[in-house]
């Protein structure tokens, strides 16, 4: 009885085993298809366990019947035979358990083969989206590489489209603002460029409004700036060749305004040899007034007023580029003249400031040269050691300390008497102002200094050699005169006696 129960427990143990231990999966990696298959496997295992339990019960009943028959036949046998019976039974049951264990091993190996076959198609069926959702931060080497996010792909595609679109686009500046308000003017403007090639779209930018409102609200309500008569436009063609043909319209007049046409992908470079800088402009100045002012100097290629990107109001300066280099010399002669004298479209009396346009490379070089000159000026006239200390002080103190650093005093190299500098501590202590012209020689006594300053007195006169005569007191002078008072002395003594008598009388009273 005990052996059959042990065999049934073994069968149940192997039936429920899932094979070798696998890595625990995360919560996000649970596959619903695999869960369903595992549930089916568990149901099949339970059915097999029930069948095996029924077989074990039938075998137990047969064994009990055999034991009862043997007990009836062998009542008179010896004790040794009774002892041998369980040994014989054990040998039979061991053979049976070996056969059952062999069957269990075959079932176990078959199960493993089925699980391996099921796992291979499951890995192939997993999509890229399921991999993204699972565990992006896991470091396991068995996981497949993650794909690029769809958002980044969309951004890259959008940028590539914009770059491709720029090859088909042109910029048109100084366009009349009637293009926005009047539909007929808009159709005429579009037809002007449609004659060159088919136009895909037209966009208007740099529209200035009179009130600080959202752009869509201000555009719908048509609250445009009264002193800003022009806008900029972007025209997209369907053919790249049409862009080159549209560039020929640069400088053409539409509704009384000279248009500036340029490519977006390959804009024309500014040639500083053919360009002039115009300053001292009014903030509300228009390009058309500059076209009229400088057209007398030669053929103008374009006029560009630098404007604020938010308000679309000018910053007070512009660039005028000519088609010929010689026109620049004539344009420089307009320096200091009023713009109202040169153009009829403006009443502004500001005097223009015209100069040659500088190249960007030369400006950068000039800035670098200025910085070098500033650095060299601070270290000019210094020794090698002082320059090294100066550079160390700059790195330690920073910009603020660098600005405050004026004089360098190295430790152990203080000012000395031989350097021709006055000892300020001694001069302040004596109350004497330091004399920059006075030079103190080493080893000179005080008497020698006085001789050097005042000379040696002679015959009792200062500076002539000898000693000075001591000044006499008033009594000594009276004795020298023979005790006779002079008129001046009597006058001086008279009021004194009167004063003394008045004092004595006041005391007696």
Curated annotation (Swiss-Prot):
In terms of Gene3D superfamilies, this protein maps to: 3.30.70.330
- Any Pfam family from its record, for instance, is RRM_1
Give yes or no: UniProt keyword RNA-binding: yes
Q: Where is the composition biased (Basic residues)?
A: 347-359, 426-436
Question: Where is this gene product found?
Answer: Nucleus, Nucleolus
User: RRM domain: from which residue to which, for each copy?
Assistant: 168-266, 274-359
Reply yes or no: does the keyword rRNA processing apply.
yes
Q: Enumerate the UniProt keywords alphabetically.
A: Coiled coil, Nucleus, Repeat, Ribosome biogenesis, RNA-binding, rRNA processing
Put simply, this protein is called Nucleolar protein 12
What does the record give as the organism's lineage?
Eukaryota, Fungi, Dikarya, Ascomycota, Saccharomycotina
